[in-house]
């Protein structure tokens, strides 16, 4: 990892990098996503869940010049090859939108988790960009660590999902997207796996 603006926790590594994405790039990503949003589902679920209230869409890394540049910049910060990352996911949370406490990593104690890991590898790193400032609410909370990150346009939040040198879930990586109370919240996320995705 490159040296962050703010190191929030050491194990798992949780850190923020300020002004990584420009205001123009944030606006372009929002504009690209606006007309493509679908109701979000929880990983592994087949229907809309009350756990997650948002809309999302996905972009291949080379689908647009701004998408490519932002994705390459993030990969250079986390020091993982970009082809180890899933497509870029852009999400909008309106007032009342939230994502209850969850893990981004796949559960090695379930058949679905083991199957997914064998096929595409574990999600090792989460890299989340805040695309706008939120009027009220919408923080990213790590409840077991009492760490709360306020959305700030262009800031990148990076955290490890697994124990050091392992694909086993780090229990302190549990996090949630707090309720948006005013305005809306836009984020873009890359999940980096332990093996190539393409």
Q: For each predicted feature, which ranges?
A:
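Fe(II)/2-oxoglutarate oxygenase catalytic core
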Residues: 1-198
């Amino acid at each position: 990892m490159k040296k962050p603006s703010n190191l929030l926790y050491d194990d798992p590594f949780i850190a923020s990098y300020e002004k990584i994405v420009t205001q123009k790039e944030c606006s372009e990503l929002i504009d690209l996503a606006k007309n493509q949003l679908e109701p979000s589902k929880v990983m592994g679920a087949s229907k809309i869940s009350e756990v997650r209230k948002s809309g999302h869409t996905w972009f291949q890394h080379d689908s647009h010049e701004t998408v490519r540049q932002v994705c390459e910049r993030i990969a250079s910060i986390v020091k993982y090859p970009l082809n180890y990352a899933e497509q870029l996911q852009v999400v909008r949370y309106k007032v009342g939108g939230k994502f209850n406490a969850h893990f981004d990593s796949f559960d090695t104690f379930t058949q679905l988790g083991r199957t997914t890991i064998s096929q595409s590898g574990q999600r090792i790193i989460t890299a989340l960009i805040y695309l706008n400032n939120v009027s009220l609410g919408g923080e990213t909370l790590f409840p077991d660590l009492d760490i709360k990150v306020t959305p700030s346009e262009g800031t990148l939040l990076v955290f490890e999902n697994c124990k050091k040198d392992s694909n086993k879930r780090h229990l302190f990586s549990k996090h949630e997207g707090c309720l948006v109370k005013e305005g809306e919240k836009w984020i873009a996320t890359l999940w980096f796996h332990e093996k190539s995705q393409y």
